[in-house]
A protein has these predicted regions:
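General structural signal for secondary-structure boundaries
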Residues: 45, 53, 69, 122-123
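Aromatic-lined carbohydrate-binding surfaces of glycoside hydrolases
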Residues: 4-25, 46, 64-80, 153-155
Length: 256
């Protein structure tokens, strides 16, 4: 593994990054409604970056566009990447991190097309807030690269119209479109499992075509890149999901 996204997945859409910095004994315990658990916030931004340095992985950071927005994203970027002399850069320094992290890649939300997502949005709603958020973030740090949310899965009812509308609204500020895809295991046999690679190829081909259409529409010289930042074999039975909250904190944080 060379790259890890933080805070990852559905968790981020209700996450307040300020809860995960500073003295651990003062960090609040919060309900994590995405995964129906208690989040202790004992592992936050600075702990993640210490881990990333030790393991030599490249970080991708994600901002909350589910319950928060432009201002919060700007503050988080300032905390991580601005040198000193401002409220949030000096907050980072007060937490024992003198030098800015210089986080290069940032995701603008996570799977905002999904009805399961806290703060779920239409393509139009998401496209607008992502474009404005990206614009402000690049005013703070012009060297960052931004990843906008594509369809959560190629099986979504709104695919690929979602991707087209989001790119239409964000093409000028976005550098990558996120692709997420999970496949079932071998319940239907090895041949069926392996054949799913054909579906993935078709998924990528379709999204490339969508991006080319928007590029031509915008008369842009920029080629949109793609970030496959969630993928794997889905092994969690659907009947395990319920509305009960586990009052015991996760032993492994769902933020990773």
């Amino acid at each position: 593994v060379t790259t890890v996204r933080y805070p990852g997945g559905n968790f981020v859409s209700a996450y307040h990054w300020e809860d995960g910095v500073g003295a651990k004994e003062k960090r609040p315990h919060k309900l994590d409604l995405a995964w129906r658990s208690i989040e202790t916030n004992e592992f936050g931004t600075n702990e993640f970056m210490k881990w990333a340095k030790k393991t030599n992985v490249n970080p991708i950071f994600t901002v909350n566009l589910g319950t928060r927005g432009v201002e919060d994203a700007a503050h988080y970027l300032e905390y991580c990447n601005f040198s000193s002399g401002t409220q949030y850069s000096d907050m980072r320094k007060s937490h024992g991190v003198d030098e800015p992290y210089g986080i290069k890649m940032w995701c603008l939300g996570n799977e905002m097309d999904g009805s399961w997502q806290i703060g779920h949005k239409s393509a139009e709603e998401y496209g607008k807030i992502a474009a404005e958020t990206g614009k402000v973030m690049k005013l703070i740090d012009p060297d960052i690269e931004l990843i906008v949310c594509g369809s959560s899965l190629s099986s979504m009812d709104t695919y690929p119209e979602w991707d087209m509308e989001v790119l239409d609204k964000t093409y000028d500020v976005a550098d990558y479109l996120a692709l997420h895809q999970y496949y079932a295991g071998q319940e239907k046999g090895t041949k069926t499992f392996l054949a799913q690679s054909v579906d993935m190829e078709e998924y990528i081909h379709t999204i490339r075509s969508v991006a080319q259409v928007i590029k031509q529409k915008k008369r842009s010289k920029k080629d949109m890149k793609f970030s496959v930042d969630e993928w794997g074999v889905w092994a969690v039975p659907s009947n395990t999901v319920n509305n009960e909250i586990d009052e015991k904190p996760w032993q492994i944080a769902p933020a990773i």
